[in-house]
Amino acid sequence: MKRIVVVSGLSGAGKTTAMGFLEDLGYFCVDNVPGNILEELLKLFMSSDLEKMAMAIDVRSEHLGDPISAVERIKEKTNTLVIFLEASTEELLRRYALTRRRHPLQKDGIGLEDAIEKERKILSRIKEIADVVIDTTSMNTHQLRETLTHFLVNQSGGTSVRIMSFGFKHGIPMDADFVFDARFLPNPHYVPELSSKTGLDSKVEAYFKNYPVVEEFIEKIYEVLKVAIEEYQRTGRRIVTVGIGCTGGKHRSVYIAHRLKEMLEKEGFTVIEKHRDIEKV
């Protein structure tokens, strides 16, 4: 079966990295595709002997046609995965300061921050129809490639679940569909022999086993997610991102995220586990 990937997102969020990775995987890649030739390009691809194609759409694609409507029509006809990349404004400002590149909307006296927010609004429609939204704020190139690999492997069908532990003091993940707050639970950070360990450690696990409220909370989250995931599968949603947060993202959220992964995998769901802030102080 022919496979099509559409990559879009904010300038500076990683589209170039994503397209380079897709090219390495053998995809025929076309960058900055104007909206008025998307469907014509699809026809050429479908009649060719190529098996995989990736198309990048950014804010400049709107100048020639409506790329979003074209992508919606393509999704109805083909096995297409739409990936949207974003990052926090603060991180995008930092990246632009490092590269000293000019934002595509930064003209007529408009500042960089205003250009970023304008682009966010313009691309909000394509974010809404994306199968996968990836927040690259805390990712390096390797982590982005690893995340893309997971979604591409599972492109053939079904709903994948991405469970991410995080620390509220480091910010809530922008791409989370669900966020659960574990800060009310007992905290092993205040136990001297457990403070330096993580929620993946057997001694921390034993600590949580002493508190029935922890398991009760996990069971409640599991029940909610099971209903939601099954409904997402029915409607064709490709990915659900679940954020589990505690104060620092090292103990409670990590333990709960890992337990939920184990429980959901037993039900046959495809799950990717990520601990965003586990190495942070």
UniProtKB/Swiss-Prot annotation:
SUPFAM superfamilies: P-loop containing nucleoside triphosphate hydrolases. InterPro entries: P-loop_NTPase, RapZ-like, RapZ-like_N, RapZ_C. Belongs to the RapZ-like family. This is Nucleotide-binding protein TRQ2_1124. GO terms for molecular function: ATP binding; GTP binding. ATP binds at residues 9-16. It comes from the Bacteria. GTP binds at residues 58-61. Signal peptide: none annotated. Transmembrane segments: none annotated. Pfam families: PapZ_C (PF22740), RapZ-like_N (PF03668). Keywords: ATP-binding, GTP-binding, Nucleotide-binding. Displays ATPase and GTPase activities.
